[in-house]
């Protein structure tokens, strides 16, 4: 392949030599390769005194070797670089002053150079040449003439070459070749060198070249060994000497990577992840201190974390025992271990029971003084209870002759439940009368015990001893455990409820009738706000005032407490039942049911045909009528009198009753809030459909974005369904 004539003008190619890749480079580089120059350092302005400097040699292109140049350009200083990206060119030919293609011996022998040339060299390069003559070896110069080969290239890669020396050796040998030319053509040689370098240095790559400033200052004669040590570290001479793992400063290349580094090769770039780290590293990467998650080498240490977890568990296992063993008085300690299967009582339970013990003994001491009229009532009610509740009791009632199986006095609720659930066991003594008392209510004198019962010793018995029970489980015992009831209920409601003879928790309400109007008592669901005046809400501990109340006879409050609860209980059960059924409480007769059905239908119709009501004015007369009527049905006045209001009745009495909860015509102890809420709920249900409808109509007509339309409409429908369901 012969080069084009334009190329021949620039460069004469040796015909015997097979052109290698570097000789194929175009004389006029294409546009594409021009941008590469921007990465390289700028070329310096030509200056005669710096003619010999390695900057020239550096900026020269890799393929411009002197053996290819014609005689016209023989005077150009050589620009071949030893680290050229292409394969090394055989330096078979060196320059004589006259014939272009004569072969020559080693350049560095000073005999081959004319005297004037050696004289014209700067003193630095002369000293360099002398040193080279002493220390020169083919190892140092892999491209010395005749040895340039692939082998030497490999050896060059293995050997880190001190760059600075090489620059000077090259400049010496090239300049010596160039300056051998007669001195008169100095100008032309300079111009041609400029042209060639500017033409061909464009495709030079920055990473292959050295910036010119790494050159020694021209006057200095620093010892070469220092430079070889320092420069080989600071400058990446060949591809092989490039550091195997990157680090911010090359002096640390030989330091081994820090201990816990995530990636061993990129040790300093990545933040060290060792657990031993005393201070956060200065790397910009966010620090994870002693992170076992991110560090693969710490996976073996992970089990330590898992071992660290069990001690709290062990402590938890130990803690109930500790509570049982140490925190309890001896009386409680005896029965505590006897509950193997049951959940361990929590600390509040035990505290409450401890609180309870002295109070109960006080009550027992105070008991025998109470005698008189309430006892007769007690006997009557207990007889009635025996008759009415016999089907509910699971075992025969104890008589005086039977010894009672020794049972702990104050068992935890779980124990009680365990005793009561197997039906074969005799029930606790206090079972039968218990239903006739609201759960938390403290003693009222009607429950005072009969004097023949040996109650105080029973109260103070240690749990293990057998009890000598009275003839029948008269309610006289119930006061002993009565003050305890709210606490136990608060502790374990599910277990106490079967005790009380109630239905399980799911069912709303149970009323126990003992035959007399005074004894019908409702056991409201736990947490219910409607408790009588003396009754404890189940969450509270016993207050001292209430324990006092329990301990002493209180004749005056007995009257009001005894009588009103009957209608209230009826009302509450009806309310709840109505809530479950159709949300219309208080219907006692079929006519009332029909009326309710009528109102329900009317409610539905009002919901389906809202335009009758306008948003601003509220519901029309008919709807207000039935609103008031639902409120009237909700109000307990109607229930208590047993009269039901018809569907067309006017709302006045019910409004009076519901707006003023303390109006004296219904029982004062019943709280008034539910009625107001009920009333409000009915009104809201009546008005809601129209409000929703009108607003959605407004929105439909409004010119707003579709999304907000949709959102608002969806919201109104949600509210509508929630409130009016």
UniProtKB/Swiss-Prot annotation:
<dbReference type="GO" id="GO:0043588">
    <property type="term" value="P:skin development"/>
</dbReference>
<dbReference type="GO" id="GO:0007186">
    <property type="term" value="P:G protein-coupled receptor signaling pathway"/>
</dbReference>
<feature type="compositionally biased region" description="Basic residues">
    <location>
        <begin position="41"/>
        <end position="51"/>
    </location>
</feature>
<keyword id="KW-0472">Membrane</keyword>
<dbReference type="GO" id="GO:0009791">
    <property type="term" value="P:post-embryonic development"/>
</dbReference>
<dbReference type="GO" id="GO:0010856">
    <property type="term" value="F:adenylate cyclase activator activity"/>
</dbReference>
<dbReference type="GO" id="GO:0016020">
    <property type="term" value="C:membrane"/>
</dbReference>
<dbReference type="GO" id="GO:0071514">
    <property type="term" value="P:genomic imprinting"/>
</dbReference>
<feature type="region of interest" description="Disordered">
    <location>
        <begin position="256"/>
        <end position="340"/>
    </location>
</feature>
<dbReference type="GO" id="GO:0003925">
    <property type="term" value="F:G protein activity"/>
</dbReference>
<dbReference type="GO" id="GO:0048701">
    <property type="term" value="P:embryonic cranial skeleton morphogenesis"/>
</dbReference>
<feature type="compositionally biased region" description="Polar residues">
    <location>
        <begin position="260"/>
        <end position="276"/>
    </location>
</feature>
<feature type="region of interest" description="Disordered">
    <location>
        <begin position="584"/>
        <end position="624"/>
    </location>
</feature>
<feature type="compositionally biased region" description="Basic and acidic residues">
    <location>
        <begin position="314"/>
        <end position="326"/>
    </location>
</feature>
<feature type="compositionally biased region" description="Low complexity">
    <location>
        <begin position="643"/>
        <end position="658"/>
    </location>
</feature>
<dbReference type="GO" id="GO:0007189">
    <property type="term" value="P:adenylate cyclase-activating G protein-coupled receptor signaling pathway"/>
</dbReference>
<feature type="compositionally biased region" description="Pro residues">
    <location>
        <begin position="459"/>
        <end position="473"/>
    </location>
</feature>
<dbReference type="GO" id="GO:0047391">
    <property type="term" value="F:alkylglycerophosphoethanolamine phosphodiesterase activity"/>
</dbReference>
<dbReference type="GO" id="GO:0045669">
    <property type="term" value="P:positive regulation of osteoblast differentiation"/>
</dbReference>
<protein>
    <recommendedName>
        <fullName>Protein ALEX</fullName>
    </recommendedName>
</protein>
<keyword id="KW-0966">Cell projection</keyword>
<feature type="region of interest" description="Disordered">
    <location>
        <begin position="177"/>
        <end position="226"/>
    </location>
</feature>
<comment type="subunit">
    <text>Interacts with the N-terminal region of the XLas isoforms of guanine nucleotide-binding protein G(s) subunit alpha.</text>
</comment>
<dbReference type="GO" id="GO:0009410">
    <property type="term" value="P:response to xenobiotic stimulus"/>
</dbReference>
<dbReference type="GO" id="GO:0045672">
    <property type="term" value="P:positive regulation of osteoclast differentiation"/>
</dbReference>
<feature type="compositionally biased region" description="Pro residues">
    <location>
        <begin position="423"/>
        <end position="442"/>
    </location>
</feature>
<dbReference type="GO" id="GO:0010854">
    <property type="term" value="F:adenylate cyclase regulator activity"/>
</dbReference>
<dbReference type="GO" id="GO:0001894">
    <property type="term" value="P:tissue homeostasis"/>
</dbReference>
<dbReference type="GO" id="GO:0006112">
    <property type="term" value="P:energy reserve metabolic process"/>
</dbReference>
<feature type="compositionally biased region" description="Low complexity">
    <location>
        <begin position="584"/>
        <end position="598"/>
    </location>
</feature>
<dbReference type="GO" id="GO:0040032">
    <property type="term" value="P:post-embryonic body morphogenesis"/>
</dbReference>
<dbReference type="GO" id="GO:0120162">
    <property type="term" value="P:positive regulation of cold-induced thermogenesis"/>
</dbReference>
<dbReference type="GO" id="GO:0001958">
    <property type="term" value="P:endochondral ossification"/>
</dbReference>
<keyword id="KW-1003">Cell membrane</keyword>
<feature type="region of interest" description="Disordered">
    <location>
        <begin position="638"/>
        <end position="675"/>
    </location>
</feature>
<dbReference type="GO" id="GO:0007191">
    <property type="term" value="P:adenylate cyclase-activating dopamine receptor signaling pathway"/>
</dbReference>
<dbReference type="GO" id="GO:0051216">
    <property type="term" value="P:cartilage development"/>
</dbReference>
<feature type="region of interest" description="Disordered">
    <location>
        <begin position="508"/>
        <end position="528"/>
    </location>
</feature>
<feature type="region of interest" description="Disordered">
    <location>
        <begin position="396"/>
        <end position="481"/>
    </location>
</feature>
<dbReference type="GO" id="GO:0032024">
    <property type="term" value="P:positive regulation of insulin secretion"/>
</dbReference>
<dbReference type="GO" id="GO:0030425">
    <property type="term" value="C:dendrite"/>
</dbReference>
<dbReference type="GO" id="GO:0071377">
    <property type="term" value="P:cellular response to glucagon stimulus"/>
</dbReference>
């Amino acid at each position: 392949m012969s080069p084009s004539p334009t190329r021949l003008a620039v460069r004469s190619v040796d015909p015997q030599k097979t052109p290698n890749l570097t000789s194929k480079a175009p004389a006029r580089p294409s546009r594409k390769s021009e941008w590469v120059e921007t990465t390289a350092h700028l070329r310096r302005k030509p200056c005669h005194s710096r003619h010999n400097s390695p900057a020239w040699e550096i900026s020269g292109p890799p393929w411009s070797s002197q053996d290819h140049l014609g005689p016209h350009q023989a005077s150009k200083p050589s620009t071949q670089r030893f680290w050229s990206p292409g394969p090394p060119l055989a330096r078979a030919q060196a320059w004589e002053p006259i014939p272009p293609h004569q072969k020559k011996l080693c350049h560095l022998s000073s005999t081959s150079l004319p005297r004037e040339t050696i004289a014209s060299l700067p003193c630095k390069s002369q000293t360099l040449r002398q040193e080279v003559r002493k220390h020169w070896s083919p190892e140092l110069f892999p491209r010395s003439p005749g040895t340039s080969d692939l082998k030497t290239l490999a050896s060059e890669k293995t050997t880190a070459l001190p760059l600075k020396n090489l620059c000077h050796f090259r400049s010496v040998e090239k300049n010596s070749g160039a300056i051998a030319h007669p001195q008169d053509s100095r100008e032309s040689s300079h111009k041609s060198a400029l042209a060639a370098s500017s033409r061909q240095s464009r495709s030079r790559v920055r990473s292959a070249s050295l910036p010119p400033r790494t050159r020694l200052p021209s006057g200095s004669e620093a010892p070469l060994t220092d430079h070889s040590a320092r420069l080989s570290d600071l400058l990446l001479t060949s591809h092989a000497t490039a550091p195997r793992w990157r680090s911010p400063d090359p002096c640390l290349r030989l330091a081994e990577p820090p201990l816990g580094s995530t990636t061993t090769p990129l040790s300093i770039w990545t933040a060290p992840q060792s657990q031993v780290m005393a201070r956060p590293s200065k790397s910009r990467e966010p620090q994870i201190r002693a992170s076992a998650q991110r560090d693969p080498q710490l996976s073996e240490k992970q089990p330590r974390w898992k071992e660290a977890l069990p001690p709290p568990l062990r402590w938890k296992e130990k803690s109930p025992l500790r509570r049982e063993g140490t925190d309890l008085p001896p009386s409680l300690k005896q029965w505590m271990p006897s509950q193997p299967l049951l959940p361990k009582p929590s600390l509040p339970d035990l505290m409450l029971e401890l609180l309870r013990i002295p109070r109960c003994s006080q009550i027992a001491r105070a008991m025998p003084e109470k005698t008189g009229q309430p006892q007769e009532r007690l006997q009557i009610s207990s007889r009635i209870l025996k008759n009415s509740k016999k089907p509910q009791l699971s075992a025969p009632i104890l008589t005086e002759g039977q010894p009672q199986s020794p049972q702990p006095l104050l068992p935890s609720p779980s124990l009680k439940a365990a005793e009561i659930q197997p039906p074969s066991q005799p029930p606790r003594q206090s079972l039968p009368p218990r239903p006739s008392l609201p759960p938390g209510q403290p003693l009222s004198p009607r429950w005072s015990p009969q004097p023949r019962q040996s109650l105080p010793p029973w109260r103070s018995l240690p749990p293990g001893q057998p009890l000598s029970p009275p003839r029948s489980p008269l309610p006289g015992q119930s006061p002993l455990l009565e003050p305890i009831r709210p606490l136990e209920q608060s502790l374990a409601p599910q277990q106490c409820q079967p005790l009380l003879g109630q239905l399980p928790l799911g069912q709303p309400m149970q009323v126990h009738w003992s035959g007399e109007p005074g004894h019908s008592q409702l056991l409201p669901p736990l947490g219910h706000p409607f408790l009588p005046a003396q009754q404890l809400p189940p969450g509270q501990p016993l207050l001292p005032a209430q324990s006092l109340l329990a301990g002493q006879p209180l004749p005056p409050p007995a009257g009001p407490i005894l009588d009103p609860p009957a209608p209230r209980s009826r009302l509450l059960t009806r309310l709840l039942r109505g809530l479950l059924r159709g949300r219309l409480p208080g219907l006692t007769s079929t006519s009332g049911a029909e009326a309710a059905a009528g109102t329900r239908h009317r409610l539905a119709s009002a919901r389906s045909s809202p335009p009758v009501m306008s948003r601003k004015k509220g519901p029309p007369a008919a709807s207000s009528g039935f609103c008031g009527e639902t409120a009237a049905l909700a109000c307990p006045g109607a229930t208590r009198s047993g009269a039901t209001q018809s569907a067309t009745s006017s709302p006045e009495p019910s409004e009076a009753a519901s707006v003023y909860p303390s109006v004296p015509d219904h029982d004062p102890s019943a709280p008034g809030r539910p009625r107001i809420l009920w009333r409000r709920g009915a009104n809201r249900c009546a008005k809601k459909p129209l409000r929703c409808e009108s607003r959605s109509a407004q929105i439909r007509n409004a010119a707003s974005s579709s999304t907000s339309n949709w959102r608002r409409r969806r919201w109104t429908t949600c509210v509508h369904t929630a409130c009016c369901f």
